[in-house]
């Protein structure tokens, strides 16, 4: 069985580590990621942002904790240039899409409404609820 690379947007990872609103869905998604059918992926940008923000909300989080649960994907100049060519107002969203595409991710899970409705062709840009429904983990 092929492992599906699932890209998590920064907001999902922050929900997981900080207990923000939606933490239940984030917990379920990370639990699903422990199944060998999925590889949970995040960009290096997400890892950096989560460490920065979590200092206030999850002070015990260490940089070494993140790769225990998530594959950290590289970002490079080529992805940066591709992100510039996407017709998206939020450049960070464009970078995330570019990173996910370059690294073979099959879907992006995000709580960001602008990203969910950006109109970019990608195999799947899903809300946490949509993803959990697809795998049978609905509430």
Predicted regions and their residues:
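Short, well-structured N-terminal submotif of metal-dependent ribonuclease cores
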Residues: 1-41, 56-60, 129, 133-139
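Structured helix-beta-strand junction loops
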Residues: 36-37, 68-69, 86
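Substrate-recognition element of Asp-dependent hydrolases with the DxDx(T/V) motif
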Residues: 39-45, 50
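Active-site neighborhoods of divalent-metal-dependent phosphate/nucleic-acid chemistry enzymes
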Residues: 71-117
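Acidic, PIN/NYN-like endoribonuclease modules and their adjacent C-terminal/linker elements
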Residues: 102-139
